[in-house]
Regions:
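Active-site-proximal loop/turn and secondary-structure-junction residues that shape catalytic pockets
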Residues: 27-29, 83-87, 124-128, 160, ...
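Conserved, mostly hydrophobic/aromatic
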Residues: 14, 61, 79, 107, ...
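Noncatalytic carbohydrate-binding groove/subsite architecture in carbohydrate-active enzymes
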Residues: 96-246, 267
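Aromatic-lined substrate-binding rim segments of carbohydrate-active enzymes
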Residues: 1-62, 66, 94-123, 186
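A structural motif corresponding to the C-terminal end of an alpha-helix
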Residues: 10-20, 64-75, 106-118, 147-150, ...
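C-terminal beta-sandwich/jelly-roll accessory domains of carbohydrate-active enzymes
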Residues: 319-448
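Aromatic/acidic polysaccharide-binding cleft in carbohydrate-active enzymes
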Residues: 212-338
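A solvent-exposed, charged loop/short amphipathic helix patch at secondary-structure junctions
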Residues: 40-45, 167-185, 330-346
């Protein structure tokens, strides 16, 4: 007897909100588990005791969702198997690599026999440049090519975390909770993306889509920079530098309210989320609210800026990214405290960005600026300015939430014929700023 009642509730919610799910077929139901006591984060991560029984479950699930949502809808979804199978058997990996390869092949065949048009991905692979984990996925794809089960798209987990440092004693656990050995390079994600593109070409995979299914600069739920303006600027920099090289970015995570670890009894404890456990947006949340307002026509980019267009309007994203110092990357906090977390940036000077936009049609324009920095849009910094004490009442939480909105300023500017629009902006350390240039009709224009 198969019951998918809980899944129905989740998928119904996804569908009614006009979203498309990516279904990862894991964890293992305990009644199918070969090793019932093998658990991670409270769920079973064992291989099945019977691959045929597993495939029967997958088949019944496909029948169920097809009957409920229709095959045409299902074909717009994505499906995948397992999570990070290239990690050790202390995590998601199988003790015997060949067991996983056959497990994947059987699941792939089950899904493609049901409907060849269903998109089936590479199992989300934890990518570490230069490590044996990288070789795993290359070997796996070669095996898939030989066994007629090549995935339809590539899927990766990536963190800017070094796994070779003695300080990160838990290499086999990838430092999920306490990883403190971070990349010293500000371009770690870009280097990873370029490496994957080269490997895709070497494997002869053409333009196979590449999805970043889990990404952050750290997997740690206790990295104090997660709450600060560093994270909002990190998100903007890395998405804009790589937007045309990947097919998706999946940020880890939406909220600090994660079940993987016990939650500290603090508001800002360095959690990965865009929201605190109380639902207060962090600066990182506003990075996405600004990014989504960019236009669909790319015009240009450079150091600290990105320009788009939508119809007759222009959008310019500015950012002043600085990377933390070598000592912090290797786990030394020194004078960093709960209420002073910016001491790890050697260069704290503001930066001035000057841009000239030519061929702007004559007319009157509204220039709107929305910005996130330590004074505006950062709930952590607002909490510090309120005294840095733990909040205890709904009134206090509400005050903080209302005080943490981004800054905003707008003005009108008239552009004469053949005039160049000159913009000059000074950005604080780790500030992000969206400038929107929109044509308006003024009374004087109408009278003409």
């Amino acid at each position: 007897v198969y019951s998918f009642s809980y899944l129905d509730k989740i998928l119904d919610f996804v569908i009614v909100n006009h979203l498309k799910p990516w279904l990862q077929l894991s964890y293992m139901p305990e009644k199918l588990a070969k090793y019932p006591n093998r658990r991670l984060f409270g769920a079973n991560v064992s291989q099945p005791h019977s691959v045929s029984a597993w495939c029967q479950l997958v088949h019944e699930f496909l029948l169920h969702i097809t009957d409920r949502y229709g095959l045409d809808t299902i074909k717009t979804w994505k499906f995948g198997l397992w999570n990070q199978p290239n990690t050790s058997s202390d995590l998601f990996g199988f003790t015997n690599e060949n067991d996983f390869f056959l497990f994947y092949k059987s699941t792939y065949d089950c899904i493609k026999d049901f409907c060849p048009d269903i998109e089936f991905s590479l199992p989300p692979t934890y990518y570490i440049v230069g490590e044996s984990y990288e070789n795993w996925y290359l070997n796996f794809l070669e095996w898939c090519k030989k066994n007629s089960c090549l995935p339809d798209c590539l899927s990766f987990t990536y963190y800017d975390t070094k796994m070779i440092s003695d300080k990160n004693h838990s290499k086999e656990s990838f430092g999920f909770v306490y990883a403190r050995s971070l990349s010293e390079s500000p371009d770690g994600l870009k280097d990873f993306v370029m490496q994957v593109l080269r490997e895709r070409r070497q494997l002869g995979l053409g333009n196979m889509p590449i999805y970043l299914s889990e990404w952050n600069n750290t997997p740690s739920q206790q990295d104090l920079l997660n709450d600060t303006c560093f994270k909002s600027c990190y998100i903007v920099k890395n998405i804009l530098e790589n937007y045309d090289r990947l097919d998706s970015f999946t940020y880890q995570a939406l909220t600090d309210l994660m079940a993987d670890d016990a939650l500290p009894n603090k508001l800002f404890f360095g959690g990965l989320g865009l929201f605190t456990v109380n639902g207060i947006p962090k600066a990182s949340y506003y990075a996405y609210t600004l990014l989504r307002q960019l236009g669909d026509q790319f015009l240009g980019r450079g150091d600290g800026y990105f320009i788009t267009r939508k119809h007759n309007s222009y959008q310019i994203m500015l950012y002043n990214y600085k990377h933390f110092n070598y000592l912090y990357a290797n786990g030394e906090r020194f004078d960093m405290t709960e209420t002073d977390r910016y001491t790890v940036f050697a260069d704290s000077d503001p930066v001035t960005i000057e841009l000239c936009l030519s061929n702007i049609p004559q007319g009157t324009y509204k220039i709107s600026e929305t910005y996130v920095n330590r004074t505006h849009g950062s709930s952590y910094d607002q909490w510090v300015s309120m005294g840095g004490l733990e909040l205890t009442t709904p009134y206090e939480f509400d005050l903080l939430k209302k005080a943490s909105s981004p800054g905003f300023h707008q003005k009108l500017m008239h552009i004469a014929s053949d005039e160049t629009l000159r913009l000059n902006a000074e950005l604080e350390l780790l500030e992000i700023r969206l400038i929107q240039i929109t044509p308006v009709i003024c009374p004087s224009d109408v009278s003409r």
